[in-house]
């Protein structure tokens, strides 16, 4: 099977620094392992070309490589460009036009299918009309971690290593960082706590607790993975739409601690975790640290599994969008 990818080709994992880049790189690797041939086409450039010209260029590229699908790994890509691009491609391309997003977009996105990381089926069980639209134009493929990067490492000391997630991007949103950092002062065992800030990956000073902002400054995936591979505990600090890093930490053997209502239920159920209150019970945490068990629980969440679910869709007939 041939697939046309909208976006940049990443040659090495060391080039990956963002969520979209992670999808682009890891999906490409998984597709290649499955025997899929990938061709790449540039993203739309507003002000440089018209939507009509871009559609023609994409269709020409798709025809030239006999593509069965056009896939944009960039998060909800076709909703970030003029709507007519996606709609024209859906109408004129015989194969699937697809994108990736956190959750269901019902039939609002100008694509044939949105592959979702989160399973939103439960949201529409009491609304048959919306449930039909959800099932027709969305498919849950789940989440994954690159097991070449995120895997169990043997510990060489008895230091409890804790990774505290970065503070919320939006400082006006609710964030548990300060309370969690203050809880570190109650630990009575040797430990090291690390976090992610605008200055990169840093060690937390328990004698000088402060919440340092993080505004999405890119950190190489290789560097971040090396940090998580050392962690016994990963602490969520704020509500997450996905919580992908939670899976990556669990792949490395970390026990996940989270305040209530910070992770989607289907995400949380897949990892060994504790829901914490304002006062963390460190005795219970330490008793539940089991790196081998934590890693074993999430081993099935691979990029190959996600690629396989997408390919299952691409070999079927795509649905009609009618006049949408």
Q: Which residues does each predicted region cover?
A:
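Short alpha-helical segment that forms part of, or immediately flanks, the ligand-binding pocket
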Residues: 225, 247-251, 265-266
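Extended catalytic core of nucleotide-activated donor transferases of GT-like folds
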Residues: 39-129
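Short acidic/histidine- and often glycine-rich active-site loop of Leloir-type glycosyltransferases
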Residues: 260-274
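Acidic donor-binding loop of glycosyltransferase active sites
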Residues: 226-241, 254
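Short hydrophobic beta-strand element within catalytic cores of glycosyltransferases
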Residues: 255-259
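Short beta-strand->alpha-helix junction loop in the catalytic core
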Residues: 103-104, 120-121, 135-151, 200
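Conserved catalytic-core segment of nucleotide-activated headgroup transferases in glycan assembly
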Residues: 23, 146-149, 155-207, 211-221
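A charged, aromatic-enriched C-terminal amphipathic alpha-helix characteristic of glycosyltransferases
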Residues: 19, 277-322
């Amino acid at each position: 099977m041939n697939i046309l990818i909208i976006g940049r080709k990443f040659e090495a994992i060391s080039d990956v620094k963002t969520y979209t880049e992670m999808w682009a790189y890891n999906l490409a690797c998984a597709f290649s392992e499955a025997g899929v041939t990938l061709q790449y086409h540039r993203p739309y450039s507003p002000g440089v070309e018209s939507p009509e010209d871009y559609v023609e260029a994409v269709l020409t590229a798709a025809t030239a490589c006999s593509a069965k699908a056009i896939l944009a790994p960039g998060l909800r890509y076709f909703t970030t460009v003029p709507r007519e691009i996606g709609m024209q491609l859906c109408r004129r391309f015989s194969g699937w036009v697809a994108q990736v997003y956190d959750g269901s977009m019902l039939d609002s996105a100008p694509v044939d299918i949105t592959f979702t990381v989160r399973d939103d089926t439960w949201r529409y069980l009491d609304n048959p009309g919306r449930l039909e639209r959800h099932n027709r134009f969305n498919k849950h493929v789940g989440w994954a971690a690159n097991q070449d990067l995120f895997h169990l490492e043997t510990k060489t000391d008895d230091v409890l290593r804790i990774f505290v997630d970065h503070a919320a991007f939006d400082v006006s949103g609710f964030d548990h960082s300060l309370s969690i950092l203050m809880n570190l002062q109650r630990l009575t065992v040797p430990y090291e706590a690390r976090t992610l800030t605008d200055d990169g990956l840093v060690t937390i000073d328990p004698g000088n607790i402060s919440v340092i902002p993080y505004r999405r400054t890119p950190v190489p995936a290789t560097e971040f993975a090396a940090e998580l591979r050392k962690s016994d505990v990963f602490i969520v600090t704020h509500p997450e739409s996905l919580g992908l890093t939670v899976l990556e930490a669990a792949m490395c053997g970390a026990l996940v601690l989270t305040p209530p209502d910070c992770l989607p239920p289907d995400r949380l159920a897949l990892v060994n975790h504790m829901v914490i209150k304002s006062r963390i019970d460190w005795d219970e945490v330490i008793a539940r640290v089991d790196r081998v068990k934590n890693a074993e629980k999430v081993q099935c969440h691979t990029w190959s599994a996600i690629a396989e679910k997408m390919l299952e869709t691409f070999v079927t007939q795509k649905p009609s969008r009618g006049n949408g």
